[in-house]
Structure formats: C-alpha cells, structure tokens
Amino acid sequence: MFFIGIALLTTTAALCQNKKEMDEPVRHFCVNINAGLGANYNTWFLEVQGEYNPISFLGINVGMKFLNPCTQDESLHIVCPEGKYELDEYSTFMYHFILHPSIHLCAPSIKLDNVGDKLIFRMEYGILLPLNHFTKGHAYPQPDNGQLPDSYSPIDIKNIKSGTPFYHETSVSANLVSDRWKLTLGYTFSNLDIYGSARNAYLGNTHIEFEKKKRGDEVFIGIGYYL
C-alpha cells in the first residue's frame, strides 16, 4: 500500500510542478531537529537529521534518534521460584540510539502569500536500525516484610541477544517553509519494538516480560534550516 502511495505521489508531484516552481532554485541541503512523543509507548525522542534534496520533490535523509522513557522512576516486579525481585530503571533494556535512513517525496507546494511562504506535504519511508542490542541489568531481592538484610547482592539478568535487525517506519507531515526555515508537524507509523533486544531476558529460569505493543507510532514536531 505504501509503495502504491509513493508511485501516486511521485507521479502527481512530477506532473504538477508548474514552470515557475521548476525554475526556482532548489536548496539541496537541510538540517532538521525533530522531537516527539510515543503514541503507543510512554516515550519521548529527539532526532538530528541531515537532508539532501537532489530535486524539488525527492530527497534522502539520515538521522540519529535518541529515545528515552517519559518517566524514570518505574520498576518491574518479578516473581520467580527463587523469590521476589525488583528490576529498577528497566529502561536500560530498551533501545536508546537508533540510526534512521529514509527517503521522502513531496507534493507540489502551496503558496500561502506573496512573500514566499509555502506549505508542503511530505511522505517519508525509512528503516530504524537500533544500535544498542546488548543490554544488561540487575534485579534486587524484595523480601515480604519489606526489610532488606544489611548485606545482599543484586542478581544479574541473563539476556540472550534478540531483536529484529531493523524496523520499518512511514511518516506523513505538513511543512511550513519560510525562506530558509522550515517548521514541521507530523505522525509516524512504525513497527518499532522498543524492548526488542530484551525479549530473551531471564532471571534464573524465569522469562522477564517487558511491555510490548503492536506498534511504535509517534507524533512529532520539528524545525529545519536550509543551507
């Protein structure tokens, strides 16, 4: 379905470029900073992205995304034959650094006034390449009476490497361009599993169940500057 949309958007963009717009100089390079919130997971992200536009309606992008939970004080309680344990700051098991290459297509721009402001709708397809696959952590014993002994040792979590090497994402956005500046509002559809590298994590022989959603969608805003 996405590739049908790309074909239609490409054809429309190519046919609808009027002569005046085709004659306008294309600013080939743009630096973007995007930030957003997870629509399914309780996360936020920040991404720095470089953009190259060989022609007015087609471009390629490379970004580095930093992902983090919105709350840091959450803990995961684990009950196993060895007893009760608590995994503090289990966000250490999630993906934090993600490489994000993509391509984008733009619909013909809509002139908003006589000073050059434009509204551009854009569709982007990319892959998400998590960089931190090897995660480790510790679980702490939680006695029934709530009192820990004076001396105790945390238990290491065994984590067998897992996770998909990459994930897919498609985003749609509206971009307001004024001279060299660009303001973006968009939504991303993704199959990202933020705990993908910890699906084979164990405490002893007990499998640890991290939160799992069907999708990893995000809503985002961004600002860009054309060089």
What are these regions (language model features)?
Residues 32-36, 47, 82-92, 154-160, ...:
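Extracellular loop and loop/strand-boundary signature of outer-membrane beta-barrel proteins
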Residues 49-147:
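Gram-negative (and chloroplast) outer-membrane scaffold detector with strong preference
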Residues 31-37, 60-64, 101, 121-127, ...:
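Membrane-embedded beta-strand positions of outer-membrane beta-barrel proteins
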Residues 16-67, 72-75, 106-108, 224-226:
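Short glycine/proline- and aromatic-enriched beta-strand/turn motifs that initiate or cap beta-hairpins
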Residues 27-31, 42-46, 56, 91-99, ...:
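Residues that define the transmembrane beta-barrel architecture of outer-membrane proteins
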Residues 23-31, 76-85, 145-155, 200-204:
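Flexible, solvent-exposed coil segments and beta strand-coil junctions
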Residues 168-227:
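Predominantly the C-terminal beta-signal and adjacent terminal strand-loop region
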